[in-house]
């Protein structure tokens, strides 16, 4: 079995690609996996760390406005198509998989033109531009949200799979997680995460909340993101009241345990975060990042809010007082928390990897 996978730019495109590769190699240890990305993208760092080889092509994103940058990008796109063609013919894959990001555009498009079997995976409610275009050419389209169906014309290509997540999120018990992160405490645990890189707006709001309300019936575990950590530490200072029960970390190496242990999650609305929180069935206050491409995080957040699993607060109206009111309102209403948790769990799609793998096998056999 020979599988080519392309996706990059952000962790939201790269981690699903790695998860799919891991699923295939677990089932077929002799399978050959070839990743294709850019030399400057995050994929060039994460893919080798995951144990896979990556080949590079030349490609750059297109801006929405006419600019000299776009002229250069078109030239790079043409070069990338030529490079992708060569890589595909040399590797001769059984299936070519794309997980989003502009880098997979030339690879998947060229694969369709050369007659190879192709599948794309879309993580968000509002699909990225690359996948919306590729949807017209590829054989199969795996979606994470039913709400994304409207953006693709060829309904017969669609399959609802959900987002691939690590198995640890499904295997950890509540008791084990609580023992690790909230043992012996009678306070509610609130986990705050702003995605893999953190979210400045969420961090600042939580800092202001802790300064205004240092003594609460809840404690906060704030994961700032590495680049925000020192700034947040300085803003909090060394006030004993503020940090007595609360904790601030640059990143979490054990997200599955922390997420399972918390009573309430405050987070941004990245597709993988949404998949993880629903997998463990937790209620959430979701604050979508306003600067994401196509405002896709707001679409993700709305989908979960409409299912009754979350409350959405837009960044433009977010402040410490509003967040505090939402937190205390939820924690004082046990029935509502339970209803949100149930709705969250019902929203989960935990068989994404198995479904994508089955689709790949079906394509190879057809």
Swiss-Prot record:
It is a peripheral membrane protein. GO terms for biological process: carbohydrate metabolic process; cell division; cell wall organization; lipid glycosylation; peptidoglycan biosynthetic process; regulation of cell shape. InterPro entries: GlcNAc_MurG (IPR006009), Glyco_trans_28_C (IPR007235), GlycoTrans_28_N (IPR004276). It holds the Pfam family Glyco_tran_28_C. GO terms for cellular component: plasma membrane. It is found in: Cell membrane. The keyword Transferase applies. Coiled coil: none annotated. SUPFAM superfamilies: UDP-Glycosyltransferase/glycogen phosphorylase. UDP-N-acetyl-alpha-D-glucosamine binds at residues 10-12, 124, 166, 196, 297. GO terms for molecular function: UDP-N-acetyl-D-glucosamine:N-acetylmuramoyl-L-alanyl-D-glutamyl-meso-2,6-diaminopimelyl-D-alanyl-D-alanine-diphosphoundecaprenol 4-beta-N-acetylglucosaminlytransferase activity; undecaprenyldiphospho-muramoylpentapeptide beta-N-acetylglucosaminyltransferase activity. It catalyses: di-trans,octa-cis-undecaprenyl diphospho-N-acetyl-alpha-D-muramoyl-L-alanyl-D-glutamyl-meso-2,6-diaminopimeloyl-D-alanyl-D-alanine + UDP-N-acetyl-alpha-D-glucosamine = di-trans,octa-cis-undecaprenyl diphospho-[N-acetyl-alpha-D-glucosaminyl-(1->4)]-N-acetyl-alpha-D-muramoyl-L-alanyl-D-glutamyl-meso-2,6-diaminopimeloyl-D-alanyl-D-alanine + UDP + H(+). Its EC number is 2.4.1.227. It comes from the Bacteria. Keywords: Cell cycle, Cell division, Cell membrane, Cell shape, Cell wall biogenesis/degradation, Glycosyltransferase, Membrane, Peptidoglycan synthesis, Transferase. Pathway: Cell wall biogenesis; peptidoglycan biosynthesis. Cell wall formation. Catalyzes the transfer of a GlcNAc subunit on undecaprenyl-pyrophosphoryl-MurNAc-pentapeptide (lipid intermediate I) to form undecaprenyl-pyrophosphoryl-MurNAc-(pentapeptide)GlcNAc (lipid intermediate II). Belongs to the glycosyltransferase 28 family. MurG subfamily. This is UDP-N-acetylglucosamine--N-acetylmuramyl-(pentapeptide) pyrophosphoryl-undecaprenol N-acetylglucosamine transferase. It comes from Alkaliphilus metalliredigens (strain QYMF).
